[in-house]
C-alpha cells in the first residue's frame, strides 16, 4: 500500500514522515531535498534539469518498494513533480502520462501551518505554498487518486489522523476484494464449478 504525503513547502510533511518512521512504518524520504543538498541540480538555477533528476530518482525509489500490504509512506510522489512543471508554466514531460496512478492508494495533502519556515533548501513563501497545494491536489485527483486533506494541528495529531484514515481505507479495500471475489464466483460458471 503506497501512500503519498504531499503539500507545499513548510507544511510539516517531513516531520510527519519522520514520526511515521519512528512508529515503525516504512517511508521514502523526500527526493527533492536530497538533490538540493547535493548541490549539483538546484531548482532556482535550472528547474527543468532539477525536476528531471528528482523524477528519475523518485521513480527509482518507488520501483524498489516491494511491500504491498503494509503502508509505505512517501514524502511526495511522482505527480508532485508534475505540479511544479505546471506551476512554473513549463511543458509537462510525457513521462507523467506513463506513470501508473493505481500504484498510489491514497494521497494526504498537508495543509499549511500558521507559520512559514524558510531555510537553505526552502526558498519559497506562504503564497507559493498555497498555490502549489491547489495544483498538487489537482494532479492527484485528476488521476482518481483519493486525496485527504490534513488540517493544521499538532504533528502527532496529524499522524493519528493519517493512520486512522489509512486503517479505514484498508478495511474498505478488504471488503472490496471480498465483494469482487463473491461476485466473480456468482457470475462465472468456471469459478463455481467443482474441480
For the regions a protein language model found, what residue spans apply to each?
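Conserved lysine of the Walker
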Residues: 13
Amino acid at each position: 500500500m503506497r501512500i503519498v504525503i504531499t503539500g507545499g513547502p513548510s507544511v510539516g510533511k517531513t516531520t510527519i514522515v519522520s514520526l511515521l518512521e519512528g512508529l515503525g512504518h516504512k517511508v521514502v524520504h523526500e527526493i527533492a531535498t536530497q538533490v538540493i543538498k547535493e548541490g549539483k541540480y538546484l531548482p532556482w538555477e535550472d528547474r527543468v534539469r532539477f525536476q528531471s533528476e528528482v523524477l528519475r530518482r523518485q521513480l527509482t525509489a518507488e520501483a524498489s518498494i516491494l511491500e504491498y500490504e503494509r503502508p509505505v509512506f512517501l514524502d511526495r510522489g511522482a505527480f508532485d513533480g508534475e505540479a511544479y512543471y505546471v506551476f512554473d508554466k513549463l511543458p509537462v514531460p510525457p513521462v507523467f502520462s506513463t506513470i501508473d496512478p493505481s500504484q498510489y492508494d491514497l494521497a494526504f495533502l498537508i495543509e499549511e501551518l500558521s507559520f512559514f519556515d524558510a531555510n537553505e533548501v526552502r526558498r519559497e513563501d506562504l503564497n507559493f505554498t498555497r498555490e502549489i497545494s491547489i495544483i498538487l491536489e489537482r494532479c492527484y485527483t485528476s488521476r482518481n487518486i483519493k486525496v485527504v486533506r490534513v488540517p493544521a494541528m499538532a504533528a502527532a495529531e496529524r499522524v493519528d489522523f493519517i493512520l486512522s484514515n489509512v486503517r479505514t481505507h484498508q478495511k474498505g479495500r478488504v471488503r472490496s476484494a471480498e465483494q469482487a471475489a463473491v461476485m466473480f464466483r456468482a457470475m462465472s460458471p468456471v469459478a463455481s464449478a467443482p474441480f
